[in-house]
Amino acid sequence: MNSLVATPVPPHFYEYSRLSSPHPMSTPTHTPINRKRKADDDGNDHDGRMSASPTNSPAFTPRSLPAPRSFKRSRPNVSGRPLSLPRLLETLDTDALRGILRSMCERHPALADEVIHTSPRPSVSSALQVLRNYQSTLQNSFPLGGNPESDYAYNRVRQPLGNLLDALSDFTPHFLPPHETQASVSLSYLDGATDIIHALPRWHSPQNNIERDSAYDEICKAWILVIREAAKRGGGIQLQYGGWDQKLAKHNQNAGGRLQAAVNELGNSLGWMHGPDSQGYGSSTGGDLVSVREQLLSGTYGLGTPVKVGPW
């Protein structure tokens, strides 16, 4: 009977510990410190980080990538070559450009017409500046010391003097009617051009002053032409306002009376505008007549004229 009864087997050590202790088993104390990590551990950690909730993770700010810099590719073969046309024009000054353009127009007449129609219209200030440049060249050509009115000085400055007079004779017709339709533009140019003629040198020899006297004669004719045309346009308002009577009288005084014909023409035009009752040009009395324009603006034009009443 005893042989038939199974001998009880004692419990296993780990099972006893699990059944006897209510707390989980603590980690073993003898853990190797320098245990190497396996590839599976790295993969598990990476998967854990990727599957973790991003709520506690810091926000990533988008970074703009720097723009790719463009570099010119270096030429494999370095050799000399001429400049392009834009770079070549940058190296030329104004005088060189004028010379090139002038020579091209002389060789190709059709190109000259295109340049004339394409170029902007010269202004009074630009034309007078060119004349002043010639005048400055003339003044710098005088010899140092000696008499500036002698024949020797005249021979030294004859060429720049001729250049100034030629430029003056070329620019003046450009600002005269009918080519120039604005009387104010013509008067402004003549005012500046006459000042340049006043600055021309005077010489001891009368024959050397012929060119200066001729310049006064030409500018006087130009004044007369502009005054007549201005008197026909708008009732001569440009002549009445602007003090042209005083300016022309001063020019005539500086010219030694060589512009008297232009002064007389302006006086006749203003006298005709003021009416037959005016007591001459330039009179300054308390009974001076009000101009036609002022009468029109104030509404008093024609109030003193008798009006016939009754049958005509």
Curated annotation (Swiss-Prot):
Low complexity composition bias: residue spans: 20-32
Main location: cytoplasm
GO terms of molecular function: proteasome binding
Entry keywords, A to Z: Cytoplasm, Nucleus, Protein transport, Transport
InterPro entries per the UniProt record, alphabetical: Cut8/Sts1_fam (IPR013868), Cut8/Sts1_sf (IPR038422)
Family (UniProt): Belongs to the cut8/STS1 family.
Transmembrane region(s): none
Species per Swiss-Prot/TrEMBL record: Aspergillus fumigatus (strain ATCC MYA-4609 / CBS 101355 / FGSC A1100 / Af293)
Annotated region (Disordered), positions in chain: 15-83
Gene label: sts1
Single GO BP term: proteasome localization
Lineage: Eukaryota, Fungi, Dikarya, Ascomycota, Pezizomycotina
Purpose: Involved in ubiquitin-mediated protein degradation. Regulatory factor in the ubiquitin/proteasome pathway that controls the turnover of proteasome substrates. Targets proteasomes to the nucleus and facilitates the degradation of nuclear proteins.
Pfam families: Cut8
Protein name as catalogued: Tethering factor for nuclear proteasome sts1
Subcellular localization, as worded in the UniProt entry: Cytoplasm; Nucleus
